[in-house]
Regions:
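Acidic, glycine-enriched active-site microenvironments
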Residues: 1-208
Length: 208
């Protein structure tokens, strides 16, 4: 018997885990509360967070040529996607063309009735400057990081294996897709993308 798995089998396992990551995590990693806290502690240490990140949210905007702008907020609670904590925040149309101002509007509105330990912005480090324009009660009690494809957006860099990056004000950290904590943060980002794209398609259908 060959102990080495062939490439096709490895791909099937990877696909299964990608499609069933929540169940896999729940039934294996999270059987012991210490494992949950261990993952959260890794994130706190990795990004020098002031908060222990029990609740993490990620935001993505959707619009149709700057019409019907809205931000979608995906959420993880104890590392599991928490749909009851998802939010859909409509933005005044006059702000739709300005991602920065509409993000500011969204965050202020979100934190009026919600909390989060860590906010993930799907943008470059530049967007982290939003914290300078937010009320102190939000900034003092919340951590912010961003995820950015950077040069990985182009086909040439995808071929070369260029990765995505996490950004803080002090750090630029390549995403390691072999680390569970990194993979889960990317999953949360992708979930925000999914919500925004679903809304965008629905809006176009309504226009037609």
């Amino acid at each position: 018997m060959n102990d080495n798995l062939d490439q096709q089998t490895l791909e099937q396992i990877k696909k299964f885990l990608d499609n069933n990551i929540d169940n896999f995590i729940t039934t294996t990693v999270f059987q012991d509360e210490r494992n949950i806290n261990g993952l959260l502690a890794k994130i706190q240490q990795k990004f020098d967070l002031k908060n222990f990140p029990y609740k993490i949210i990620c935001l993505d905007i959707s619009h149709n040529s700057w019409k019907n702008p809205a931000w979608w907020v995906s959420a993880m609670l104890w590392w599991i996607l928490s749909k009851k904590n998802y939010r859909h925040i409509k933005v005044p149309e006059e702000l739709g063309w300005n991602d920065y101002e509409s993000l500011k509007y969204c965050l202020i509105k979100y934190f009026k009735n919600n909390t989060a330990d860590l906010v993930i912005l799907d943008w470059w480090k530049w967007q982290l400057n939003i914290v300078n324009d937010l009320p102190n009660e939000i900034v003092l009690n919340t951590d912010f990081i961003s995820i950015w494809k950077w040069k990985a957006r182009s086909r040439k860099w995808k071929i070369s294996g260029q990765t995505e990056y996490f950004f803080t004000f002090e750090k630029q950290i390549p995403v390691d897709y072999n680390l569970l904590e990194d993979k889960l943060l990317i999953k949360l980002r992708d979930e925000a993308h999914r919500l925004a794209n679903k809304y965008r398609i629905k809006s176009w259908q309504n226009i037609k």
